[in-house]
Amino acid sequence: MLPEDLESTPFPIIDTHAHYDDAAFDGCRDELLRQIYGYGVKKIINASVDLDSSAENCLALSRKYPFCLTAIGVHPETVEAGGTLDEQRLLSLCREPSVVAVGEIGLDYHYSDDKKAEQRDIFKRQCEIANELSLPVVIHDRDAHGDTLDIVSETRPKGVIHCFSGSTESALEYCRLGMYIGIGGVITFKNARKTVEVAAAVPMENILLETDAPYLSPVPYRGSLCNSAFIIKAAERIAEIKCIPVETVLKVAALNAARLFGNALKLN
């Protein structure tokens, strides 16, 4: 299932954001996870999008595959008009041993304006709960850059802005707040000027590598099912931008992941 032309990785890979619970993997999940582990992907964080089936499926994956860790949270797209956060359910799920973060949480104003208040309230409360549990957050920000930064500035969690799409100035502001910037396959796209500028400006010590699998496959694999081995393509592009070896990108990103998410992300 891995492309024959995919070059080998010079250093073990940590994918800090994926969705192997997604139905897109239903016909190939087990074989693919075995393949990518053999390729060199040694840690994966699966991010849930709700506190129900997605959370349970992510946790089940971690029980079957110990190299899979879990982030538990309510994604903004699953927030309902008039909805509230089931705090006790979130707290209960976060006690599971594979849970290393609260996520995927955040704001998404791309499709609708009718749930902005609910999204903000639930996002803010999840940041507060993450702080109470001493867990980092994994943040989704789509077309909501100002409000996302405001809530992070107010609640001051530690964490990562997943698939960062904001300006260089806001990326550097997040770095000043102690946050990490998540970069994946988008950086290989021909229209990725903003992401390239962010990668050039942000210190390597503030960058995490991710895929968002099964989404956002990098060039030259666009249109195919994304998987964690494809991180090598994002790492190569960052190495080119920063004029450093690919191995350095992978190594520093792995150290960053362990620093943020804890010992469970340390490479043996």
Question: Would you name each region that the model predicts?
Answer:
Residues M1-N268:
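Mid-domain alpha/beta scaffold segments of enzyme catalytic cores
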